[in-house]
Amino acid sequence: MFQSLKLTHNSSIPFLISSGGTTSRAAADNHWVLDLRKNYQNISYDLNNTCVEIEAGVTMGDLSNFLVNYKRSFPIGLSGKTGMGYILTGGISPLSRSRGLAIDQIMEIRGFWGNGEQFHLAKPKESKSSILEWKGLCGAAIFLG
């Protein structure tokens, strides 16, 4: 994946990513498209800390079906066909009022910025200012002050 990002950066060809089944921007003329749905489908559950790790191609329906085995749930919204974009854009669901947005459930995220640099962001456990920065990143900025 990293090589694909570097190639598009050097050639100035626009780059699109697809990870679910509902985006209107999964393909376009004269664009590179990286479809994560086929090769990034892993889901794992850590019984010790009750955290789930998912790869970028997992749909919310697949996640929900997986979590049933552990008597767990995730606020996936009204469609099981959405992918990682659902979470990264906030993720409003019927459970949002009581459980928060989907993005509020994220403990850490790893990926690549548009320029090809890797990143790893984790929910802070220390200072109040770090927690406010994390909440702002997760979409709560308009409620913070």
Regions flagged by a language model, labelled:
Residues 4, 62-69:
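Short active-site loop/helix that positions an aromatic residue
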Residues 10-14, 30, 70-73, 117, ...:
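Loop/turn elements at helix/coil->beta-strand transitions in domains of secreted/extracellular proteins
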Residues 15-19, 34-36, 45, 54, ...:
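General beta-strand structural signal in soluble alpha/beta enzymes
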Residues 75-145:
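FAD-binding subdomain of flavoenzyme oxidoreductases
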Residues 1-41:
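Glycine-rich N-terminal segment of FAD-binding domains in flavoprotein oxidoreductases
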Residues 8-10, 25-28, 45-46, 67-68, ...:
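Extracellular/periplasmic catalytic domains that process cell-envelope and extracellular macromolecules
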